[in-house]
Regions:
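A recurrent flexible, glycine/aromatic-enriched loop bordering the glycosyltransferase active site
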Residues: 1
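A glycosyltransferase accessory/donor-loop signature
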Residues: 4-148
């Protein structure tokens, strides 16, 4: 998540600086992110996790520094921005992100109200079976449980 001072960017000709950076670094994997990280690393400001709650933060074993986990666990309970990262998006029938329903809450405020992905019967059965296995502690959950 980015908060950008566009006036400052324009006054400091940042777009041209991006182009120059790209000319000197032609092997970037995530071009936009790599340029931003390379140019602004020393002046970046970290924001609380609740402003960028990502899929990896919601896993039972979060992909984050261990020292940050207590803060993260508190902040993901009431996110300000849910960033649906990763390959499975809430509009995919096989998404099991705990905040999937939040996506549909806001989708229902648009002209696509009540639009839901088609879920094959086979997957519905798998979801029910997984719930039983979680309940009996025979299968670990991939995601933490979010209290509503």
């Amino acid at each position: 998540v980015l908060l950008i001072n566009l006036k400052w960017w324009r006054e400091n000709n940042i777009c041209n600086n991006f182009i120059e950076y790209l000319k000197c670094h032609d092997n970037l994997k995530f071009v936009d992110q790599d340029i931003l990280n390379g140019m602004f690393y020393s002046s970046r400001k970290l924001i609380p996790f609740k402003w960028n709650v990502q899929d990896g933060f919601l896993r039972r074993k979060p992909k984050i520094r261990k020292s940050c986990i207590p803060t993260l666990q508190n902040e993901i309970k009431s996110p300000a921005i849910i960033h649906y990262t990763g390959s499975r998006k809430p509009w995919d029938y096989d998404c099991i992100n705990p905040y999937k329903e939040s996506y549909f809450k806001y989708l229902d405020m648009t002209k696509w109200k009540h639009t839901r992905p088609y879920m094959p019967l086979k997957f519905k059965f798998k979801l029910m079976l997984d719930k039983v296995l979680y309940f009996l502690y025979l299968k670990p959950r991939k995601y933490i449980k979010i209290s509503k």
